[in-house]
Amino acid sequence: MKITRTDVEHVATLARLELTEDEKDRFTGQLDAILAYVEKLNELDTDGIIPTSHAVPVENAFREDEVRPSIGVENALANAPDRVEGFFRVPRVIE
């Protein structure tokens, strides 16, 4: 698969990114090189190889929860520019 400048422009639009002409050219080349490398990986013979999600065996190491004293509401809000009834007040984001 070949990455085109149109592909880069489309992805930039979806990500709401404004790219310069130089960035569009540079990213087109970089992404094309990455996909070419991935295509080479597809040529590997993986018959008999067990699919894994990690290259090395990984196990979850859980620990018991510890109840500890909290810093308290007053300390947590001490440097807050604005607060109401024990909560941070932030500017409205959605009208």
Curated annotation (Swiss-Prot):
Catalytic activity: L-glutamyl-tRNA(Gln) + L-glutamine + ATP + H2O = L-glutaminyl-tRNA(Gln) + L-glutamate + ADP + phosphate + H(+); L-aspartyl-tRNA(Asn) + L-glutamine + ATP + H2O = L-asparaginyl-tRNA(Asn) + L-glutamate + ADP + phosphate + 2 H(+)
Gene3D superfamilies: Glu-tRNAGln amidotransferase C subunit, N-terminal domain (1.10.20.60)
Keyword Protein biosynthesis belongs to the record: yes
Enzyme class: ligase
InterPro entries: Asp/Glu-ADT_sf_sub_c, GatC
Taxonomic superkingdom: Bacteria
GO function terms (MF aspect): asparaginyl-tRNA synthase (glutamine-hydrolyzing) activity; ATP binding; glutaminyl-tRNA synthase (glutamine-hydrolyzing) activity
Keywords: ATP-binding, Ligase, Nucleotide-binding, Protein biosynthesis
Function, in words: Allows the formation of correctly charged Asn-tRNA(Asn) or Gln-tRNA(Gln) through the transamidation of misacylated Asp-tRNA(Asn) or Glu-tRNA(Gln) in organisms which lack either or both of asparaginyl-tRNA or glutaminyl-tRNA synthetases. The reaction takes place in the presence of glutamine and ATP through an activated phospho-Asp-tRNA(Asn) or phospho-Glu-tRNA(Gln).
Subunit record text: Heterotrimer of A, B and C subunits.
PANTHER family linked: GLUTAMYL-TRNA(GLN) AMIDOTRANSFERASE SUBUNIT C, MITOCHONDRIAL (PTHR15004:SF0)
Record protein name field: Aspartyl/glutamyl-tRNA(Asn/Gln) amidotransferase subunit C
Organism: Geobacter sulfurreducens (strain ATCC 51573 / DSM 12127 / PCA)
